[in-house]
Amino acid sequence: MLCCMRRTKQVEKNDEDQKIEQDGIKPEDKAHKAATKIQASFRGHITRKKLKGEKKDDAQAAEAEANKKDEAPVADGVEKKGEGTTATEAAPATGSKPDEPGKAGETPSEEKKGEGDAATEQAAPQAPASSEEKAGSAETESATKASTDNSPSSKAEDAPAKEEPKQADVPAAVTAAAATTPAAEDAAAKATAQPPTETGESSQAEENIEAVDETKPKESARQDEGKEEEPEADQEHA
């Protein structure tokens, strides 16, 4: 039996040796290789995880940066929109303010127009009245000048200075002139006292013209009488 066992053991050993020889690798070496493979795979797994984590972190950081960049333009757009709305609100407010001064400017202009119209309306009646007054005063002055210039009183006053013998005729001329001149003076006084109306001025002008026309024949007759008396006085002196 023992011999059989020895023989079998030898055979087994021989078989193992043959296998080792065939493989050329010992089991220890196989185990070491397997351990190294396991370690390498584990290390690779760890490195992969690290790389994935880094990639995830990088991706998250990139996403955060992208989100920030996206949010920044959005915030700028919102700010610009807010500024635009405030500017538009301020623009109508400022636009309404100039409108109010414009309205306020329109009211003084309207007031000025009303004052100008009232002034023109007042000046329009005053201008004809003043022109009528001037015309009436000019007519009265012309009438008084004509009456005073044509009155025989001045001539009667000059005649006594030149010729003394005519003193007898002078009082009659003076009395006649005194009788005529008060009428002209009364007419002139009435013309000045009466208001400057068209009817009053026309009537006064007609009265003055009639008074002047009445005085002119009398004065011409007196002048003719004075001329006739002058040769008689010259003959007496001669």
Curated annotation (Swiss-Prot):
It comes from the Eukaryota. Residues 226-238 have a biased composition (Acidic residues). GO terms for biological process: axon choice point recognition; axon regeneration; regulation of growth; tissue regeneration. GO terms for cellular component: cytoplasm; dendrite; filopodium membrane; growth cone membrane; perikaryon; postsynaptic density. It is found in: Cell membrane; Cell projection, Growth cone membrane; Synapse; Cell projection, Filopodium membrane. Its main location: membrane. Residues 84-95, 119-130, 168-199 have a biased composition (Low complexity). The modification Phosphothreonine is found at T181. One of its GO terms (molecular function) is phosphatidylinositol phosphate binding. Residues 139-154 have a biased composition (Polar residues). The keyword Transmembrane does not apply. The keyword Lipoprotein applies. This is Neuromodulin. It comes from Macaca fascicularis (Crab-eating macaque). The lineage of its organism: Eukaryota, Metazoa, Chordata, Craniata, Vertebrata.
